[in-house]
């Protein structure tokens, strides 16, 4: 037993992701002159423009039988021009530092509470964001959650969302109400840009 590990131990995880485009050399300055060719050659070991990069460190700690938490730090670079199709005055790349706390509390044999806090710091796009969420699970079927996302950078907008989920056997029914921010939404491997919405879901 150590001071860091304690009675239940401490988990440490480090993940690195780095994605770049191809190192391309165009064969013709005018694309209209290209016939029967891809239009460029590629260096086998060269690297093109940075598309996406992140380094994240995660610490998981069990404090007692009824409480455990995870702390995560992410350093992220996002090519807004390539991945989001941003143009004009929007920044080409977004550099962000993200801090996440995720805590789980076992209140009884049938009731559990999960809380999540996030802080995103960036000088690009809309600036800093904070996020908070509380999720109450009542076994075996009911889950209630309330979340708040707030831009403390440029827009000063609030995005509050509440939801109720009921599960019975193989069936699951969910009802949500609130406001969602505009941006990239990925579902089932398909990503698309969605507008800001408010209503029932």
Q: Where do the PLM segments sit?
A:
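Outer-membrane beta-barrel "beta-signal"
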Residues: 164-171, 195-201
